[in-house]
Structures are given as structure tokens and as C-alpha cells.
Amino acid sequence: MLEHFDVVVPSLPGYGFSPRPPKVGINYRYVSERWHRLMSELGYSRYGASGYNFGAGVTTILALDHPKSVIGIHLTTLESDLAPVVDDTELSDAERSYLSVNRGWDMTERGYSAIQSTKPQTVGYGLNDSPAGLAAYVGEKWRSWSDVTPTDDFLCATFTLYWTTQSITSSMRDYWDNRWHPVAPSYVSTPTAFGVFAHQTVSEGELPRSYLERLYNIQRWTVFPRGGHFAPAEEPAAVAADLTAFFRGLG
């Protein structure tokens, strides 16, 4: 990618060495405004953006609020709180099937979100006090949401980053802030690329392009044979190649 673009990689507030402001309301829009200001102060009047998980939410709102500056966005996850709101009678069979599987996934896998969006401080104290508890809490997600077995060094580095910075609690506040200070979804006209990774569709359902087109101006849709929720870390070369192809095509 560096052969074709300048690459700016900001860290979300509250993760790793990036502190989170000591106030409520640090939602997608709050962060996206800081990203836009960052790019403006670096001298970029037009730029592309990419993200997954909370980064996908920030990227979506960035494109929604600054369509003249953001030439395109690349996503690998759909944030559930920004999902299209559609009457059931308007859904296709594929969309209905996806939502049914996804609701089942919610029942078995989304317990973490329930507690992190209501009592993040409570669970945070326990995880910050126990390296084993922190490793189990984070490591279980890699086991459940990925089809790639990360190296011990990678996992230990991830756990250590959370542990040494004591940032697991501040990272979980993303769930609280975006639940209680939500940003209303709206159609994003900015050209959008979406990467669908095989393992994510196994548990969360086969995400139909038509469903995403209710919210985004989808211009590129790539299905990958490997990878899951943590795609940029699991399959970095594939994600970088898809990013490069998409943004080069936008001129």
C-alpha cells in the first residue's frame, strides 16, 4: 500500500497507549470528528478511510458527515447499531435468513456486549486485576471468531498491551458510549467497499450484499475464503490488496 498511498493509522481513544477522555459520549461521531480534524491538519483535503468493528462505525459516520472529503470507505464488519432498519415484509429470503442466524449468534455470543454496554467499569476492575482473567476474556474471542490460530507471541503481545496500559476498561466504554449516546444510521452515498470473510459468515450468517446496499453505496464486494472478525490482523495481505485495488480505482 505504501507504494501507492500515504497511510495514516490513528488509534481509537481508550485502546493501548491512546488514552480515553474522562467523560461520557465518546461515540462514533466524537471520534470521527477528531479523525477528520487530524487529516485536515496533516494537509489532506480528500482521503479514504477504512475500519472494522468500532473502526467501521467511526468510518461510516466520517463518510456520512464529510462526504466532500472522504472519497471512499472500506469496511470488513457491519456494526449492529448502524444496521439498516427494514420492515420484515421488505426483506428478501436471503436477508431474512441472515438476520435469523444473526439473532441466534446474539443469543450465544453477545453476552460480552450486554455487560460492556451497561457495566463496563465493574468487569473492568476484575480484568485489570487478573492477567489470567484478561487473557481468558480476550483470548476466547480469538478462538470463537477466527479460523486462524494466532501465534503465542501475538496473543501474549495483545494481552500485554491491554495489561500494561490498563486499557481493557477504557476500551469497553465504547460499548457504553455508543449505546447511550447513539448515532442514528443514515444512507452513506460515499463509494463503499466491503470485505466478507468466510469464518464470520459461518457463525453470524451469510451477509447479503442487498442488505448492506440499504445503508451504503456498495461499489466493491469481495468474498474471502479465510479469515473472520479480526480480518485485518488475520489476513493483512488480503485486506491490504483489497484496499489498494478499491482506492486506486477511485482515482
What is each PLM-predicted segment?
Residues 2-4, 44-95:
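Conserved hydrolase catalytic core segment
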Residues 88-120, 184-187, 213:
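The feature captures the conserved acid-bearing segment of alpha/beta-hydrolase catalytic domains
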Residues 25-41:
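Alpha/beta-hydrolase active-site loop
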Residues 1-17, 247:
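Conserved HGGG/HGGXW glycine-rich cap/lid loop of the alpha/beta-hydrolase fold
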Residues 12-26, 60:
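Glycine-rich "HGGG/HGxG" loop immediately N-terminal to the catalytic nucleophile
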Residues 116-251:
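C-terminal subdomain of alpha/beta-hydrolase-fold enzymes, centered on the catalytic histidine
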Residues 13-16, 80, 228:
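Alpha/beta-hydrolase active-site loop signature
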